[in-house]
Amino acid sequence: MLALIFITTSVWLAASQKTFTPDLVFPEMNRNSSWSVANYGEILCPTSFQSYEPKKHQILTRVLVERPSLNTDTKVEGYTCHKVKYETICDMPWYFSPTISHSISPLRVKESECKDAIAEHQLGTHVSLSFPPEDCSWNSVNTKAYEDIIVKDHPVMLDPYTNNYVDAIFPGGISSPGMGGTIHDDMMWVSKDLAVSPECSGGNKVWGLFIHLGCMGGGSRCWKSAPPHRGPQGQEPHFSLPVSFYNKIGVRFHDGEWMKVSVNLDHPNSVTFQVTDFPPCPPGTTIQTAVVENINPEIQELTVNMMYRLKCQETISKMVSGLPTSVFDLSYLIQVQEGPSIVYKREKGVLYQSVGMYQYIDTVTLNTEENQLGENARGQKVFWTEWSDSPTRPDPQEGSNGFFKYEGQIRVPLGMSLRLEAATELMWGHPVHTVSHPILHVISNHTEQSVTTWNRGVNSTNLIGQATRSISGFYNDLKLYLILALIVVSIVALVVLDVIPFKYILFILCPPLLLCRFIKCSTKEA
């Protein structure tokens, strides 16, 4: 009898116990967490994505990811030179109501101008200019302009394998040592000191899922980079490019990481999975791989990891270039592991960042209660309540990390964690050996509606965009016009009524004119 009770109780407990299947990571944040404006040039993508289910990592197929041991702390100090023009425009119509406009616009900077400005900056003799004084004249539009070069400190990363500089502001994400152009015509970057690349160290090839290794063989320049792609003028810059290592082709990301993927099956017929051609390229160029028939979880997982990394780089490229980005683009910037990391949100077109403690979330109870995201591993309900309470609130509303609320329901980018499911669609829906470039957007199809916003402003690496303000002087001069009108009407009335002879009008008119002159001068000085 006791055994029957024990078995029945065990079965009931097992049936009542919920299975925790996390499909999302979400950050816990303090109520007093501070948000700061994010700098697009400093955003780095997660270096890898780990699967939540350990069974996915059973090595049925041996997978090799080859990466150089890049020291991400190697920085090179330098400056950015940004040339701008300050304009003051005075538009005075015939009725004496001037409008003063101030505008700031970028100008193409020359190498000699940049060097001179940096020399003045280092000596502390550079004088920052502002808007010139207005020059107003009746019934005309006058413009006065000053030009200035703004010098800012801007460190970049050193690639120790090519001795090149890596940063999002460079075309293709990479620049040769010394002075280099940026993706902005009005900005140049100059290094303070030429850095020396450390020597490559020898290493052995190791099989595994994610393997870091150094150079195979000796020598100080073991790794060779392809020339950076600059593209046609005005074209969106790409932040990854093919590079070679002893005739092996991989992908180089804008933060300096190089990756080559290969798969060797556990039978004599080995298969190599390798990205051999990824943009920079014209539209329609394909991604070529050598995989033909073999579909397995490890290949799928690795494929999607690569795709997500490229999507993250594409998102950074959009933001740096001021191109439209969707709310779900932010989801490609965040990590998918537990632990502390950066949290992003957008408000009125400005990207902000803070720090949160990421935890696994099971979204099976998503929207069961208002603002509920799901439950964590402890069985606690997780909510996101930072939504607008205004009656005129927009629909949809943006949350953090690519979340948004639409028609009262929270929508989350579950494709970020359900990579195996997305990979199945990716692998079977399109032939792997020739994957067209638009396939990079397939994963975001799981995120339902996307909201596109033009994003330019404080986050941009462009230090100064277009700014205009107008000051109207009509109301300041209104009292002067009223006084003049009153004087004229009074004089006409006195003459018509023959109260005062006309010859005395000049004696009466002089004091008021002097008074008006005084008022006008006082108004200018104020």
Curated annotation (Swiss-Prot):
<keyword id="KW-1161">Viral attachment to host cell</keyword>
<dbReference type="Pfam" id="PF00974">
    <property type="entry name" value="Rhabdo_glycop_FD"/>
</dbReference>
<protein>
    <recommendedName>
        <fullName>Spike glycoprotein</fullName>
    </recommendedName>
</protein>
<keyword id="KW-1160">Virus entry into host cell</keyword>
<keyword id="KW-0946">Virion</keyword>
<feature type="glycosylation site" description="N-linked (GlcNAc...) asparagine; by host">
    <location>
        <position position="32"/>
    </location>
</feature>
<dbReference type="GO" id="GO:0019062">
    <property type="term" value="P:virion attachment to host cell"/>
</dbReference>
<dbReference type="Pfam" id="PF24833">
    <property type="entry name" value="Rhabdo_glycop_CD"/>
</dbReference>
<keyword id="KW-0945">Host-virus interaction</keyword>
<dbReference type="GO" id="GO:0055036">
    <property type="term" value="C:virion membrane"/>
</dbReference>
<keyword id="KW-0732">Signal</keyword>
<feature type="glycosylation site" description="N-linked (GlcNAc...) asparagine; by host">
    <location>
        <position position="459"/>
    </location>
</feature>
<dbReference type="GO" id="GO:0019031">
    <property type="term" value="C:viral envelope"/>
</dbReference>
<dbReference type="InterPro" id="IPR055447">
    <property type="entry name" value="Rhabdo_glycop_CD"/>
</dbReference>
<keyword id="KW-0472">Membrane</keyword>
<keyword id="KW-0325">Glycoprotein</keyword>
<feature type="glycosylation site" description="N-linked (GlcNAc...) asparagine; by host">
    <location>
        <position position="445"/>
    </location>
</feature>
<feature type="signal peptide">
    <location>
        <begin position="1"/>
        <end position="17"/>
    </location>
</feature>
<dbReference type="InterPro" id="IPR001903">
    <property type="entry name" value="Rhabdo_glycop_FD"/>
</dbReference>
<dbReference type="GO" id="GO:0046718">
    <property type="term" value="P:symbiont entry into host cell"/>
</dbReference>
<dbReference type="GO" id="GO:0016020">
    <property type="term" value="C:membrane"/>
</dbReference>
